[in-house]
A protein has these predicted regions:
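Alpha/beta-hydrolase active-site loop
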Residues: 214-237
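N-terminal cap/lid segment of alpha/beta-hydrolase-fold proteins
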Residues: 77-78, 82, 120-122, 126-167
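Short beta-strand element of the alpha/beta-hydrolase
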Residues: 170-179
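Short beta-strand/loop motif that positions the catalytic acidic residue
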Residues: 331-332, 337-339
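Hydrolase active-site cap/lid region
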Residues: 259-315, 333
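Catalytic histidine-centered segment of alpha/beta-hydrolase-like enzymes
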Residues: 369-382
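Alpha/beta-hydrolase fold nucleophile elbow
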Residues: 236-248
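Conserved alpha/beta-hydrolase "acid-adjacent" motif
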Residues: 344-350
C-alpha cells in the first residue's frame, strides 16, 4: 500500500533506559549446524537472501562438506566453489569477455557468502579479498566497465565503484549504500538496471563494513558528504542530480542524508532503515534472536560499533537515534520509505516515525512482508524493479 501522511504535532522524545543485560543467554538459541544447513538449502531452492545468487545444486554440494560452523572452515568450503568459477573466468577472459564477466560475478557471489555475514577470521578475510579480486575481473570485462574511485576521508582510504551508462554525456547519479552484511560489490551487480534508464551509479560500503573502515558513530555521515563533493567535481556525471538509496542498515544513512544533505539530494530511498526504535535495548534484546536472519546477527551488529559485549552493544545504539538527535522535525529531501509490516530485524515503527514527522513522504509497505518488505514470493529483486527503481528514475528526471 502507498501512503502519504503529514503530522503537524511532534512526538515527545523517548529516552531508552538500559536494563540489566549481562549474558547472551537472554537471546534466542542460534540454529544448530543441521538446522542451519536445512535453512540454507531451503533459501537456495527458492532463491532467497542471502543465497539468492547461488546455484542450489552447488549449495547442496557444499553443505555435504560443511562439518562445523568454525569460521575458517566455513570460508574454506564455500570458497572452494568460488575457486572453481574463478578458474573458469580466467580461462574465458581472452576469448569471451561477456561470459568471463558473468563467471567472475558467479565466483564473487560464492566468495561473498564465504565471508558472510562479516570478516571475523583469517579465512573469512581471505574470502573477502578473493571476492574483491573476482569483482575486479568482472569490472574490467563488463561493458560499460566499472571504475574504482578512491578518496581520502580523515586519513582513511575509501573505495567506491562508479559505472556510467553509454551515450549519456552527464548522467544523473544514484548513490547506493551497502547494508550490514552486504557489500558494494553485491549491489553493483543489481545496480546495472539503472544504466538502461540513463542513470549512473556510485556503490559504496556503509561505515564499519567492507572498504569503508570507519566506525559507526554520530558524525560518520560526513563520509557521504565527501562522496557528494567528489561527484560534484566530476565533469562526466551530473553531481546536481543525485538520489541516495541504502538497504537495511544502509537505509539509516539514506534517511540521515535526506536531512543533513537535503539541498544536494533529489531524493532518498529508505528500505528497512533503522531510525529510533531499532537502537533501543528492548528492541535489540528481542530482535537479535530473530530467525529471519540466517546466523551471526549479534556479531555483525556489534562489529560495526566496534564493541564486543552485549552490554556495550546495547549501551552504544541509542546515540545513533535520528529522533533523539533532533532530525525528524527538520526539512528533508523527498523520501520513499519501504518495509514489511512483519519485519523482525528493524521495527516497522521506525518507518512510521519518519512518515508521521517532518515533511510529507511516500511509503510502500507490504502487509505480509518481512525485512525490507520481502516474502518468499516477493523477492528483493522484484521490489527493487517495481518499487525502488521507478521512483529513483522519476526523481532524477531520467528516461523510463
Amino acid at each position: 500500500m502507498k501512503l502519504t501522511r503529514r503530522n503537524a504535532v511532534s512526538g515527545a522524545l523517548a529516552l531508552a533506559l538500559l536494563t540489566s543485560t549481562t549474558a547472551m543467554a537472554q537471546l534466542a538459541t542460534p540454529r544448530t549446524l543441521d538446522e542451519l544447513k536445512a535453512e540454507i538449502q531451503a533459501r537456495a531452492d527458492r532463491k532467497a537472501y542471502p543465497v539468492s545468487q547461488l546455484d542450489a545444486a552447488e549449495v547442496r554440494e557444499v553443505l555435504a562438506n560443511l562439518k562445523s560452523q568454525d569460521r575458517d572452515h566455513w570460508a574454506s568450503v564455500w570458497g572452494a566453489i568460488g575457486d572453481r568459477h574463478l578458474a573458469k573466468a580466467k580461462a574465458l577472459e581472452a576469448t569471451d569477455k561477456a561470459q568471463a564477466a558473468h563467471t567472475y560475478d558467479t565466483a564473487m557471489q560464492w566468495y561473498m557468502f564465504a565471508r558472510f555475514p562479516l570478516e571475523d577470521s583469517a579465512g573469512t578475510a581471505q574470502a573477502y579479498q578473493k571476492a574483491l579480486d573476482a569483482f575486479a575481473g568482472y569490472s574490467r570485462n563488463v561493458d560499460p566497465p566499472i571504475e574504482a574511485v578512491k578518496f581520502n576521508y580523515n586519513g582513511t582510504e575509501i573505495v567506491g565503484y562508479l559505472r556510467k551508462p553509454k551515450g549519456v554525456a552527464k548522467p544523473p547519479v544514484v548513490i547506493t549504500i551497502g547494508g550490514l552484511d552486504g557489500r558494494k560489490e553485491d549491489g553493483s551487480i543489481r545496480n546495472a538496471a539503472y544504466l538502461a534508464k540513463g542513470v549512473a551509479f556510485f556503490a559504496f560500503d556503509m561505515p564499519g563494513t567492507g572498504q569503508t573502515r570507519i566506525k559507526i558513530e554520530p558524525g560518520a555521515d560526513k563520509v557521504y558528504s565527501v562522496v557528494l563533493d567528489a561527484l560534484a567535481k566530476r565533469d562526466d556525471v551530473d553531481g546536481k542530480r543525485v538520489v541516495v538509496t541504502g538497504g537495511s542498515w544502509g537505509g539509516h544513512w539514506s534517511a540521515h542524508l535526506a536531512y543533513s544533505e537535503k539541498d544536494r539530494l533529489l531524493g532518498a530511498v529508505v528500505p528497512g532503515g533503522p531510525v529510533h526504535n531499532y537502537f533501543q535495548p528492548e528492541w535489540q534484546k528481542k530482535a537479535l534472536g530473530t530467525r529471519e536472519y540466517l546466523f551471526g546477527l549479534f556479531e555483525a551488529r556489534a562489529a560495526v560499533y566496534g564493541v564486543k559485549t552485549l552490554d556495550d552493544f546495547l549501551a552504544y545504539g541509542p546515540k545513533m537515534s535520528l529522533k533523539d538527535r533532533g532530525f525528524l522535525e527538520k526539512p528533508s529531501a523527498p523520501m520513499l520509505l519501504v518495509n514489511g509490516r512483519n519485519d523482525t530485524q528493524v521495527p516497522i515503527d521506525d518507518l512510521q516515525l519518519l512518515l508521521n514527522n517532518g515533511d510529507p513522504k511516500e511509503a510502500w509497505v507490504n502487509p505480509q512482508g518481512g525485512h525490507m518488505g520481502r516474502t518468499a514470493q516477493l523477492t528483493d529483486q522484484k521490489i527493487f524493479e517495481t518499487v525502488v527503481l521507478p521512483w529513483v528514475v522519476r526523481r532524477l528526471g531520467a528516461s523510463m
